[in-house]
Amino acid sequence: MAEEKLTFIPTADLVDIIGSDVRSCDTQFRDLGGVVEFCGKITTVKCFQDNALLKSVLQEDNPGGVLVIDGDASMHTALVGDIIAGLGKDHGWAGVVINGPIRDSKVIGQMEFGCKALGTNPRKSTKTGEGERDVTVSFGGVDFIPGEYIYCDSDGIIVSDEIVQPV
């Protein structure tokens, strides 16, 4: 059976559709990509000040996917720069949500790619490959579970265990 198509729905409308069980992320992210409204199936990476693993994930084809990166809210080193964001864009990803900073924000802001992050820091991360992939990550009062769905816009982030249909 073919998977249902995911259609972007504004997060405020999703709250109205889902109701009191809504999973809305409390963390206040900055919209730093050239695309503000994006959605997709969640893939996760948990890493701390090291971006080698997430770079390898974004080199995989994943049309419409969203990579949720938990950098433990460390602002010490950027986890994504223009090269890594470009890899994601070129491999079909809709965007990234980063519990940490990015760098090269001017270039990323001009890409047709969604990018929500806590802020910016020009400092590079290490590249040892440490981290975990496809594990549940939690921040902002929400569990981000691989295979579930994320909807992002200027109002925030909503996560759902199933595709939500517009009403």
Swiss-Prot record:
The cofactor(s) it depends on are: a divalent metal cation
Instruction: Tell me how the cofactor is bound.
Output: Divalent metal cation.
Superkingdom field? Bacteria
Extract the InterPro entries matched here.
RraA (IPR010203), RraA/RraA-like (IPR005493), RraA/RraA-like_sf (IPR036704)
Residues given in the record as a divalent metal cation binding sites: D104
Task: Please give one Gene Ontology molecular function term for this protein.
Answer: ribonuclease inhibitor activity
Where, in this chain's numbering, is substrate bound? G81, D82, I83, I84, R103
Q: What is its EC number?
A: 4.1.3.17, 4.1.1.112
Q: By its UniProt entry, which CDD domains does this protein fall under?
A: RraA_family
Catalytic function, reaction form: 4-hydroxy-4-methyl-2-oxoglutarate = 2 pyruvate; oxaloacetate + H(+) = pyruvate + CO2
Q: Which UniProt keywords apply?
A: Lyase, Metal-binding
Keyword Metal-binding annotated: yes
Q: Which GO terms describe its biological process?
A: regulation of RNA metabolic process
Family assignment?
Answer: Belongs to the class II aldolase/RraA-like family.
**Function description:** Catalyzes the aldol cleavage of 4-hydroxy-4-methyl-2-oxoglutarate (HMG) into 2 molecules of pyruvate. Also contains a secondary oxaloacetate (OAA) decarboxylase activity due to the common pyruvate enolate transition state formed following C-C bond cleavage in the retro-aldol and decarboxylation reactions.
The record's subunit annotation is: Homotrimer.
Its recorded name reads: Putative 4-hydroxy-4-methyl-2-oxoglutarate aldolase
The source organism is Corynebacterium jeikeium (strain K411)
